[in-house]
């Protein structure tokens, strides 16, 4: 592929990081950003890497998975992290930034780089003859979204309005749940949390009275599109959930079940199912429980489910308008397209969730786009690192049930040997191993 530059489309967190990484490797970049020509409902300025919702890049401690990811990115020369550190504001253990100062600094560092040419224009076609990183965000313009949709054979680039909570399997009380698939079809693939009639009535009462998170103004018209939040379903009638995600039919108690039940009934009054969410089996999601409750309310209400009294939520349910790819089928672990090899994708459209995760994906995509340009082999970061585990998760998850994911210790490769029971000590050990493995990886 003969060319003299690399395209980057989109100057959000992922695109800005990708462009900077490419330019730092001595390769000219054409960075396309449509803001300035065409606005979006969310953005207030034309600056790069504008933080639309929150000014927080979340926890900074290494015992927090996103803190580990940020430390890895610092060591990889992230322009996003450099700008965040320079514009940080007091926020306890979190890294929060002056919103305007942060985006202005990213804009200056990227736009003033001698090898980056900024082009204020909307791209409506996918380049076929130039290495290109596409990082156009969750609200990709309709024209370009249509081209990506076609590239994916009409599949895998679709709106996402809801996600169910995901739980650390080690925090589920296994004495209160049982393994079974409905009607015993196939393998016993679900953990089932049975409820008596009274438990269900109490749960329903708590759910319909729980406080929902407010929607951003630009999301309101999309609220009910393509999904049914569990709390909305519950408000339609006391038995509505019993014909939906809490349907007990075909999920009889096992013979050795000793927990509470209504009389001699062989089938629970209601059942909440949990499905394995990652290949390692360390994460489970609550099936059909997409929600827009406030996070504190999710914890309060969903911990009423038998077996989840002490559950740790690695991701709470969320609802907002988004578009993302079927990355397990469409992307390599390097963020390179399987269908059109000159293309890389980065940011929320790949199925990573969160500011830091978006920037991290742009960092990896930028590094690999530069390596392809130089005819060098692409790199896959170790699965023991946060940045590597995120790339692995979105490209190896079950495609049929794939949903956006933020970084968490549940997706990072387990430590070898006996499990460390103290959570803080375990996370410290995972972080220590991650940074050691990253250093070794960078010296090879």
UniProtKB/Swiss-Prot annotation:
The keyword GTP-binding does not apply. HAMAP family: TrmFO (MF_01037). InterPro entries: FAD/NAD-bd_sf (IPR036188), MnmG-rel (IPR002218), MnmG-rel_CS (IPR020595), MnmG_N (IPR040131), TrmFO (IPR004417). PROSITE patterns: GIDA_2 (PS01281). It is an enzyme of class 2 (transferase). Its cofactor is FAD. It catalyses: uridine(54) in tRNA + (6R)-5,10-methylene-5,6,7,8-tetrahydrofolate + NADH + H(+) = 5-methyluridine(54) in tRNA + (6S)-5,6,7,8-tetrahydrofolate + NAD(+); uridine(54) in tRNA + (6R)-5,10-methylene-5,6,7,8-tetrahydrofolate + NADPH + H(+) = 5-methyluridine(54) in tRNA + (6S)-5,6,7,8-tetrahydrofolate + NADP(+). The keyword NADP applies. GO terms for biological process: tRNA methylation; tRNA wobble uridine modification. One of its GO terms (molecular function) is tRNA (uracil(54)-C5)-methyltransferase activity, 5,10-methylenetetrahydrofolate-dependent. It is found in: Cytoplasm. This is Methylenetetrahydrofolate--tRNA-(uracil-5-)-methyltransferase TrmFO. Pfam families: GIDA. Its EC number is 2.1.1.74. FAD binds at residues 10-15. GO terms for cellular component: cytosol. Keywords: Cytoplasm, FAD, Flavoprotein, Methyltransferase, NAD, NADP, Transferase, tRNA processing. Belongs to the MnmG family. TrmFO subfamily. It comes from Streptococcus pneumoniae serotype 2 (strain D39 / NCTC 7466).
